[in-house]
Amino acid sequence: GFDNMNVFSQVTSERYNKANLHISIDASGSMSGGKLSKSITSAVAMVKAADMAGNINVVVSFRWTSDKKPVVIICYNSRKDKLTKITKLWKYINAGGTTPESLCYEALMKKWLSGVRGEDNYFINYSDGEPWFSNDDIYYHGNPAQKHTQKMVKMMKNNGIKISSYFITEGYTYRDSKGSFTKMYGRDANFIDPTNMM
């Protein structure tokens, strides 16, 4: 026994699955000011934490509408971007347009949100309103838009993606909006004030 040094020391090693985190931020006009800046601050904190952890891939996207079209852009992808991209470019992000919500989710799922076997997958959403978008061809609002969002959320879950969706409130928020948000995201819906996000 005295010749075995393992008697005196033990090392506990824990292994964690690789993880993929997608952060999607609503950059519609109503998010301007504190809501957007706090959402960005929160996202940056998660990106930095993931970078230190070393085994978490992070993608951050922003969504809004422009020229009568839904827009979603990937502003950071840890697989190929350095953290300096955030400090150099994110300061130019501004809010505008309306909330296309799951119209953008559908596009994201095709390229960014497919589940990866053996890895943990998470989707975090920041938003402050109900889905709304219209042009000459489509009117995306109310119950049909909510049902479409429900469908996309269910599809993500079926792909093994865990969801947390945050409704950002500031002052008075219509009860109907909160009800719609809960209808779309169910138990994954959370309500937060931007002053308490960090």
Outline where the language-model segments fall.
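Acidic, glycine-rich A-domain
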Residues: 1-198
